[in-house]
């Protein structure tokens, strides 16, 4: 009788242990770990404040300012050492915030971790990007003009210095130390982009402007590009910037002038900055004048406002056969026609 009772107790205890074990293990199996979310939203705010001759420091309000209106942002995430690109995306969804600034928003799929992030406006016409997938080597540069244009200034530009179009403004955001924590839902990265291109106002007086049909300028000794991830100008090699000029006046005096873009003046440059004006007359003549304006870049007007105001005067003699051809239109209403008046 005792042995029967003892066997029954052992059987009951074993059954209880089995039930308890099943509860424990089934409880563990039904609590899966949550996966980390890779969704990240990038918000890039375009800040155009303080760009001389574009959003401030306008010397001549008769001259249209360069347009800065990005439509697409190219966003890249590099590994934390700045090596390989981990992921990239193109974001085009944009809206205007309460301060009137354009904000781009878009999502990328990237694992939590430490990265370097770069974003710039994609699709500029005259500003190109070289080696976009290298953090330290990605650079913006300007498109070279055709040889037929460059040859007109071959004796006016230092040997080996390419003649390029003025670069379009390129807005860049860089985050060299961006950490994405483990998260669920959407992690948000906010950044701000600014232009790596500068705008200057150039002006010279012309006696006999009515006899001029078109005018172009080439400014040599300028920075040739910008390392966009580092925010550093490229001063070696240098380049010469080519741009068109418009007719206007300064307090009633006839002038030719332009707001032009450049990657800037080389750091510490005190000489070698020359501008050549190439004017075509109504009777088919070509008049070229070159001026050293190194000192103008050191003037208060240039340092504070990016104004290059030459005191010199270019004199254009009347045509030998008056009445042929026509000069500049007396207004700047036909800006679109005049702005690209370069023989190609």
Predicted segments with their positions:
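Sec-dependent bacterial lipoprotein signal peptides
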Residues: 1-27
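Beta-strand-rich domain onsets/edges
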Residues: 29-39, 188-197
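Acidic/polar, low-complexity intrinsically disordered N-terminal segments immediately downstream
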Residues: 30-135, 298-344
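Sterically constrained small-residue positions within well-ordered secondary structures
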Residues: 35-37, 66, 108, 182, ...
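Tryptophan-paired
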Residues: 71-131, 212-298
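Short, low-hydrophobicity acidic/polar segments
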Residues: 87-194
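Acidic, serine/threonine- and glycine-rich low-complexity intrinsically disordered segments
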Residues: 147-256
């Amino acid at each position: 009788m005792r042995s029967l009772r003892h066997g029954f107790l052992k059987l009951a205890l074993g059954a209880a242990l089995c039930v308890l074990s099943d509860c424990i293990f089934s409880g563990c199996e039904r609590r899966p770990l949550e996966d980390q979310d890779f969704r990240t939203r990038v918000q890039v705010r375009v800040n155009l404040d303080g760009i001389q001759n574009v959003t401030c420091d306008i010397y001549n309000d008769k001259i249209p300012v360069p347009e800065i209106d990005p439509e697409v942002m190219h966003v890249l995430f590099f590994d934390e050492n700045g090596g390989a690109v981990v992921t990239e995306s193109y974001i085009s969804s944009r809206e205007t915030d309460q301060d009137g600034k354009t904000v781009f928003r878009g999502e990328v799929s990237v694992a939590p971790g430490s990265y370097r992030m770069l974003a710039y406006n994609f699709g500029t016409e005259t500003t190109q990007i070289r080696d976009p997938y290298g953090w330290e080597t990605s650079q913006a540069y300007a498109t070279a003009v055709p040889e037929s244009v460059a040859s007109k200034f071959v004796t006016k530009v230092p040997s080996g210095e390419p003649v390029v179009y003025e670069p379009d403004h390129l807005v860049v955001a860089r985050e060299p130390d961006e950490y994405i924590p483990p998260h669920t839902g959407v992690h948000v990265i906010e950044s701000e982009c600014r232009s790596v291109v500068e705008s200057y106002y150039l002006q010279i007086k012309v006696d006999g402007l009515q006899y001029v049909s078109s005018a172009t300028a080439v400014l040599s000794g300028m920075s040739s590009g910008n390392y966009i991830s580092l925010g550093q100008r490229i001063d070696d090699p240098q380049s010469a910037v080519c741009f068109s000029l418009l007719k206007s006046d300064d307090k009633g005096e006839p002038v030719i002038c332009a707001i032009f873009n450049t990657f800037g003046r080389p750091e510490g440059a005190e000489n070698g900055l020359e501008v050549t004006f190439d004017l075509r007359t109504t009777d088919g003549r070509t008049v070229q004048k070159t001026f050293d304006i190194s000192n103008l870049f050191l003037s208060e007007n240039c340092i504070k406002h990016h104004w290059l105001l030459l005191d010199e005067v270019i004199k254009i003699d009347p045509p030998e056969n008056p009445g042929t051809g026509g000069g500049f239109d007396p207004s700047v209403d036909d800006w679109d026609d005049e702005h690209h008046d370069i023989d190609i």
